[in-house]
Amino acid sequence: MIVLLVVYVLYWTSVRADRAMDGEIDHLQDRWATGAVTAGAQPAPEPRRYEPGASFAIMYIPRFGADWAKPVLQGTAPGTLKKGLGHYSRTARLGATGNFAVAGHRRTYGDPFEDFPQLRPGDAVVLTDGTTWFTYRVVRRPYRTLPTDTGVIDPVPRASGFRRPGRYLTLTTCEPEWGHSHRLIAWAHLDATQSVTQGKPKALHS
């Protein structure tokens, strides 16, 4: 029974999660392609609300591989994180002033942040919401802290080195690799934006 449980945790949960993440990406791309989001359109006075548990963006991290792409969903509930990365609901919107903070599993459920410790200063974290590409740049190696250290996702995140308001990104995952006693944190700042009508950003061509 123990062997079967290990197989389920290590293999089957990841297979199901990979399918779920691919499905979320397909859903987003289909919605964007059919005009639910109009490329290059002027932003609405009231930005569209992120619906709990629903995907709204796709994240790319070249450091993790040319094919690495994960959906970003609203919220960090366990069921949400089985389908992709989760946006901390009390943090800023994508690209906005403040701190856009995102959580993801390091192991199990697709292992989206398995290679998190490999992040280095200058690495690109690229996201799109169907109209705009947002390129963030990592500012330091991953930082280890406790799960209770919620200051790391503040608008000006604690211990990040940032001293004033800006357009920031925080990524969080579990530490150690097969545990959850601590957290690994990566911070980035918004480096560039461009319309999807201009094609993919340089960071995805390097």
Give residue ranges: language-model regions.
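N-terminal membrane-targeting segments
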Residues: 1-28
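Short extracytoplasmic
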Residues: 29-58
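Short helix-to-loop capping/linker segments positioned immediately adjacent to catalytic or ligand/cofactor-binding
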Residues: 42-49, 68-69, 110-114, 124-126
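Short, positionally conserved secondary-structure boundary motifs
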Residues: 48-89
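Short connector loops at helix/strand junctions that flank enzyme active sites
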Residues: 53-54, 67, 95-97, 120
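Short beta-strand/loop turn elements enriched in aromatics
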Residues: 77-100, 134-136
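Extracytoplasmic/periplasmic soluble domains downstream of a signal peptide or transmembrane helix
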Residues: 98-100, 106-206
